[in-house]
Amino acid sequence: MELSLLRPTTQSLLPSFSKPNLRLNVYKPLRLRCSVAGGPTVGSSKIEGGGGTTITTDCVIVGGGISGLCIAQALATKHPDAAPNLIVTEAKDRVGGNIITREENGFLWEEGPNSFQPSDPMLTMVVDSGLKDDLVLGDPTAPRFVLWNGKLRPVPSKLTDLPFFDLMSIGGKIRAGFGALGIRPSPPGREESVEEFVRRNLGDEVFERLIEPFCSGVYAGDPSKLSMKAAFGKVWKLEQNGGSIIGGTFKAIQERKNAPKAERDPRLPKPQGQTVGSFRKGLRMLPEAISARLGSKVKLSWKLSGITKLESGGYNLTYETPDGLVSVQSKSVVMTVPSHVASGLLRPLSESAANALSKLYYPPVAAVSISYPKEAIRTECLIDGELKGFGQLHPRTQGVETLGTIYSSSLFPNRAPPGRILLLNYIGGSTNTGILSKSEGELVEAVDRDLRKMLIKPNSTDPLKLGVRVWPQAIPQFLVGHFDILDTAKSSLTSSGYEGLFLGGNYVAGVALGRCVEGAYETAIEVNNFMSRYAYK
């Protein structure tokens, strides 16, 4: 899910929700000789008496979603000597995880994440995947809206706009200004929720009218439970480093000025302003392009049923594949599946790590794509006769179920036929788990009913339903204590001797598609460092 309309710097990524294969097949132990501790080797052979095949490799990446694919790409492009022989295994018959792009009758829509922030790491992945010419960027001047008191109100895109927008009262703006300068209650000395941090630093209006809907758009979460440190760490660090949000901002600016500037890759595009990106044929182009480059290293319909530690070092992973049972022996393993899936797979290795990972929560979210004729848009919502903007967010206090709406056909070109408007709507989340009991028709009705309150003319014809995708376990919630849970899981694996077994994915790196890519580069560095040490053992 991705509705980061207030600042296009965080987009969320719907995680995979395939159920863990809790039935761990027990096979008779087999004595296998494998050059796991030596130089990089790869090969396959029949397992004598086992009726299957064994493969030896440097690194196995479990999960062919965007995190797993990007880790493989990062290793191949940035650390080619670390794990020259690697494989990416995916239980489904396609790559991409929750990136699902559909195209039909002149419409092109997303049923998972909708876009990404074009940061340099993201653009590096785009260029290395051969997609530079397919990149499309939204208009950085396009407005974003928040529903308040029955009206869609624009959100300021820069500080100089603050005095002039009507989403907040004069008193609310003054309270936010003083708080940002440090004239506010002191920190409580414990981990704060997003709600606690924002109300203390910026006041009630900023929280209720800006941050609460922002949390719904990014995490589909409850800001009274989300951790400020874990969910919005960059803002949290401003107060930590500078004594206040403004103080931290100036300090960060000064540090950037004094820091040595690395030369920017000349291959990368130069986006103008703060915007979001996609591709000519939708987000699916990225996982498909990476998979094509990896070729036979990507294994589809490979279901991991068990993982054990080898006495000689490394790991043995047992897979059920279309070609039968396969045993993979690898020096390192990266788990990029959702935390609840990883928990089931890792329980035989570490009860403590599995218990920690099982605590993470993923609420349900539905992505509802519908279309209206252009004339269905209310006149007061048009700019120069057109629906313009990124989209709109809906605070939970405003009497609508829908978390927010992306103006898909306004954001990127060629998303809808002439005369039609394409809207991607998200509904559900931590505060509305009841969507799981609703049919597709009921979800469309709920979204349509909400839109007629502020965007669509009440007497317009029924919308054209394009797609309804329900994600029962959608977005990992970075709740208070999230980092403690991750630390427990990682330290439990390390203390039990499971070196070279890494945790990755959006519950580790962050829910934004861009953060998954940045996290992939970070994980690739970890694997490279481990493999460098491994070579000298």
UniProtKB/Swiss-Prot annotation:
Residues 256-275 are annotated as: Disordered. FAD binds at residues 63-68, 90-91, 112-115, 511-513. Its cofactor is FAD. Its EC number is 1.3.3.4. Gene3D superfamilies: FAD/NAD(P)-binding domain, protoporphyrinogen ix oxidase, domain 3, Protoporphyrinogen oxidase, mitochondrial, domain 2. Catalyzes the 6-electron oxidation of protoporphyrinogen-IX to form protoporphyrin-IX. This is Protoporphyrinogen oxidase 1, chloroplastic. InterPro entries: Amino_oxidase, FAD/NAD-bd_sf, Protoporphyrinogen_oxidase, Zeta_carotene_desat/Oxidored. The modification N-acetylserine is found at residue 35. It catalyses: protoporphyrinogen IX + 3 O2 = protoporphyrin IX + 3 H2O2. Pfam families: Amino_oxidase. Inhibited by acifluorfen. It comes from Arabidopsis thaliana. Residues 1-34 form a transit peptide. NCBIfam families: proto_IX_ox. One of its GO terms (cellular component) is chloroplast envelope. GO terms for molecular function: oxygen-dependent protoporphyrinogen oxidase activity. Expressed at high levels in the leaves and at low levels in the roots and floral buds. Keywords: Acetylation, Chlorophyll biosynthesis, Chloroplast, FAD, Flavoprotein, Heme biosynthesis, Oxidoreductase, Plastid, Porphyrin biosynthesis, Transit peptide. It comes from the Eukaryota. The lineage of its organism: Eukaryota, Viridiplantae, Streptophyta, Embryophyta, Tracheophyta. Residues 256-268 have a biased composition (Basic and acidic residues). Coiled coil: none annotated. One of its GO terms (biological process) is protoporphyrinogen IX biosynthetic process.
